Amino acid sequence: MLETDSQRLRVVEDSLGKINVPLERYYGAQTARSLGNFNVCTRSDTMPLQIVYSLAMIKEVAACTNFKLGRISSKLSDAIVKACREVYHGQHDNEFPLVIWQTGSGTQTNMNVNEVLSSRASELIDGSRSSRLTVHPNDHVNLGQSSNDIFPTAMNLSIAMETAWKVLPSLNHLINVLKIKMHEFMNVIKIGRTHMQDAVPMSVGQELSGYVSQLQQAVDSIKSQLPLICHLAVGGTAVGTGLNCSKGFDEELCVSLTQLTDRLYRTMYKESTPVVDLIFKPAENKFAALAGHDALLQLSGCFNTTATALMRLSNDFCLLSSGPNCGLSEFVLPANEPGSSIMPGKVNPTQCESLRMVCLQIMGNHFTTSMAASQGQLELNVCKPLIAANLLHTCELLTDSTRCFADKCVRDLQLNREKIQEYVDKSLMLVTVLTPHIGYDLSAKLVQHASKFKKGLRESAIELNLLCGEKFDEIVKPMEMAFPHNNK
């Protein structure tokens, strides 16, 4: 692309240094930095291409299945298969202009795909385009199918692939980067805080381990939901009875779809092992599969829970890095771009703020998905495109933002160790370890004395004749307080 052509770049400079900008662009350094630092989900209201590609994959295995069942010839099947592969490899993206604001069953998009495949397959057979189609969009490409069962099948297929192949690896990447920092800072003692007030000592590594555990639980929850997403509506046709669909069509298609997705994964991600194997099966009850999308809603709930964990992570990083001179200033976040158009030298926690907004959007997507999933009327849910678009949007947001946050924020996280130690030395909550020795009431009196006269705990304990200095030092050891059971 022109933007990455090294022969057509100009060098511009801001307070953080030099950066390349495409020669033909009017924007400057800070815009270029933002483009590099926030490559998170660009979208519109057109039907997501993931749905189009999934429909093409389904049409491919449907053509093969219909050939095996003797319903179409090998000539038609081969042409449809070739056309399908061109579509899901992105060769005809401009042929799919429809928006999600269409019929609630996704019929228009299903027919859009049928028409494109019909025209291209006919062209492959006849050698030229013609208004007379050898391959019919309904009779051949859509054989044994209805929009009512095929569109929800494409929904589940696309969301399963996005989740297993992109969302989970990105979340695992963030977890792994956090783990590196967790081990690096495990023995750095700081003051914990509850209710935003000083509490007892802990280590920075322990604090980071909390984020790791929350995110790991989120990953496990998402993974547990994927087998249910792999139960497909295909074979239900119009209302769930399977009218006009051959017996065994759904089972054969699911087996073939499992094999196709496995081949595609190994082609796209040659050296990696999938986080979860996608094994597709016909839905046990096709009536429920057409009228309800409970599995997708539950997955959306898992994403929503993940967003709450990420929100805490981003907010805490932002708070702990506040300052640098007039805030907590325990964390030192990487300076990715200048922070203010009016205050020179200011650097803001931009990755934290970006992730925070992503989390809010994911929560909003979940609310919309919840409402849309409730719109099953009699035998059909009629908000399918909206459910698909919101979940795929969430998948893209999670994939991009977690990787960005890991690489642009967590990876280069540093500590202001002097400030952290200063807080430990000043904390009156170290008194907690004294309560087994002098009791709660005297410990409270000690804190009140130290606070009133602006003195340290040790000095105050000696003045009040509660403990001698040697005994105080023997008891009050922040490292041992942080690891009372030696579980470093």
From Swiss-Prot:
Gene3D superfamilies: Fumarase/aspartase (C-terminal domain), Fumarase/aspartase (Central domain), Fumarase/aspartase (N-terminal domain). Has a melting temperature (Tm) of 49.08 degrees Celsius with the highest thermal stability around pH 7.5. Thermal stability increases with increasing NaCl concentration. Both sodium acetate buffer and glycerol promote thermal stabilization. Optimum pH is around 7-7.5 for fumarate and around pH 8 for L-malate. Disulfide bonds: none annotated. The active site is at 195 (proton donor/acceptor), 340. InterPro entries: Fum_hydII (IPR005677), Fumarase/histidase_N (IPR024083), Fumarase_C_C (IPR018951), Fumarate_lyase_CS (IPR020557), Fumarate_lyase_fam (IPR000362), Fumarate_lyase_N (IPR022761), L-Aspartase-like (IPR008948). It comes from the Eukaryota. May be a potential drug target. Inhibiting the activity of this protein may be exploited to treat schistosomiasis. Keywords: Cytoplasm, Lyase. Its EC number is 4.2.1.2. GO terms for biological process: arginine metabolic process; fumarate metabolic process; malate metabolic process; protein homotetramerization; tricarboxylic acid cycle; urea cycle. (S)-malate binds at residues 105, 147-148, 194-195, 341, 346, 348. It catalyses: (S)-malate = fumarate + H2O. It holds the Pfam family FumaraseC_C. It is found in: Cytoplasm, Cytosol. GO terms for molecular function: fumarate hydratase activity. GO terms for cellular component: cytosol; mitochondrion. Belongs to the class-II fumarase/aspartase family. Fumarase subfamily. HAMAP family: FumaraseC. Homotetramer. There are 2 substrate-binding sites: the catalytic A site, and the non-catalytic B site that may play a role in the transfer of substrate or product between the active site and the solvent. Alternatively, the B site may bind allosteric effectors. Catalyzes the reversible stereospecific interconversion of fumarate to L-malate. Fumarate metabolism in the cytosol plays a role during urea cycle and arginine metabolism; fumarate being a by-product of the urea cycle and amino-acid catabolism. PANTHER family: ASPARTATEAMMONIA/ARGININOSUCCINATE/ADENYLOSUCCINATE LYASE, FUMARATE HYDRATASE, MITOCHONDRIAL. This is Fumarate hydratase. It comes from Schistosoma mansoni. The lineage of its organism: Eukaryota, Metazoa, Spiralia, Lophotrochozoa, Platyhelminthes.
